[in-house]
């Protein structure tokens, strides 16, 4: 394994991955804040943790080093001055309603041991947890019935989205929604102050502070020359253009392929409808088999992004991009339309490839799993009755840091 960030494919043997073990943040979910916190349901924490632990153990059993958001963020904040700076930035990004509240929350959190503090900001800070303080703020009075000073971050177990390791660099994302934007701040501090992310030649392709939204579920590293990006509900054209300019101008990658996908929650990211499982095999949702519009981005001689539009079938596109004589598309749910919709909702297309032809999937997507098995793909199925309630699969729940080259 090469040191540091090294990720030039979707299918090379996975050596190291960043996860977040689902925690008390999901206990902050109630029906009235579903829209605010981007959930449709409430996972049962005890079972969700068991399922997530089973996921991590499958990875370890297959030679993957598993590291966690809480631990890696705590390493980055070991210096008390950096910890204090982070807290001030995090609290500001949380939009507390008054200076008095912000100061009280800062002192409450800053006194905690660092690892405990990181876990606490993820799970959320309730108003009744912070020592009382005097405030004559009208905004504070009006919002007094809302239970949190700092909202929980229940989406963080989908570690794919806040950032992506691409080649020998990191893309730290400006998330589409304010609810999730703070997640990438943790990754920003990892990059700046944790040597496992900041050391050596690790570069930065996009940053938390950039203005336009992009999320990691829309980024697929097809090979050492080509990165695919979804133009989706969560990723904008302006962000893709800036990302492409930075990546293509400072790396070995030669092109960015942009897939224009439906702007709906069911097709939230590119990896919910399309993932790579082997050199020439892909899981897909049937609705993207029809001719697609995509854009190919490259740099011109002046270092500016030029793009061309292509309309073709996914099969032809992948054959051309990957220089393959043929590719095989494995439909989520097979030819059964109801199974396809059901298993798409439960992320049947969202597989995590940990080696060529070996994938981690949810066991509940049995139709798709059987099809993968028949096509010669080794399926490592994990329980997902509770963790799937967040609308993300094994790929969503993982941020690969290091893979073997293929």
List the predicted regions and their residue ranges.
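The feature marks the mature, well-folded catalytic cores of soluble enzymes
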Residues: 1-406
């Amino acid at each position: 394994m090469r040191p540091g960030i090294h990720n030039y494919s979707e299918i090379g043997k996975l050596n190291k991955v960043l996860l977040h073990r689902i925690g008390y943040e999901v206990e902050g979910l109630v029906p009235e804040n579903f829209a605010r916190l981007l959930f449709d349901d409430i996972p049962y924490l005890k079972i969700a943790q068991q399922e997530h632990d089973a996921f991590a153990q499958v990875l370890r059993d297959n030679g993957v080093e598993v590291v966690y958001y809480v631990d890696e963020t705590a390493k980055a904040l070991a210096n008390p001055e950096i910890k204090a700076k982070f807290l001030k930035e995090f609290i500001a990004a949380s939009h507390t309603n008054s200076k008095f509240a912000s100061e009280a929350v800062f002192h409450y959190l800053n006194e905690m041991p660092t690892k405990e503090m990181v876990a606490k900001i993820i799970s959320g800070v309730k108003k009744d947890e912070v020592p009382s303080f005097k405030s004559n703020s009208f905004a504070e009075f009006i919002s007094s019935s809302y239970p949190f000073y700092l909202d929980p971050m229940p989406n963080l177990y989908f570690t794919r989205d806040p950032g992506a390791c691409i080649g020998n660099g990191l893309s730290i994302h400006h998330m589409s929604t304010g609810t999730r934007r703070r997640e990438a701040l943790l990754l920003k501090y990892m990059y700046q102050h944790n040597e496992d992310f900041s050391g050596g030649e690790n570069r930065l392709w996009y940053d938390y502070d950039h203005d336009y939204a992009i999320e990691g579920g829309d980024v697929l590293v097809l090979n050492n020359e080509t990165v695919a990006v979804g133009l989706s509900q969560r990723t904008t054209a302006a962000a893709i253009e800036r990302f492409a300019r930075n990546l293509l101008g400072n790396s070995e990658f030669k092109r960015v392929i942009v897939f224009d996908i439906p702007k709906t929650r069911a097709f939230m990211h590119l990896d919910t409808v399309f993932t790579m499982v082997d050199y020439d095999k892909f899981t897909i949702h049937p609705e993207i088999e029809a001719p697609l519009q995509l854009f190919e981005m490259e740099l011109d001689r002046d270092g500016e992004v030029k793009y061309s539009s292509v309309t073709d079938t996914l099969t032809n596109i992948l054959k051309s991009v990957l220089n393959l004589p043929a590719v095989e598309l494995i439909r989520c749910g097979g030819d059964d339309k109801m199974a396809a919709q059901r298993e798409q909702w439960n992320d049947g297309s969202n597989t995590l490839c940990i080696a060529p032809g070996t994938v981690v999937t949810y066991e509940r997507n049995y139709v798709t799993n059987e099809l993968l098995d028949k096509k010669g793909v080794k399926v490592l199925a994990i329980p997902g009755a509770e963790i799937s309630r967040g609308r993300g699969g094994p790929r969503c729940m993982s941020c690969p840091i290091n893979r073997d080259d293929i």
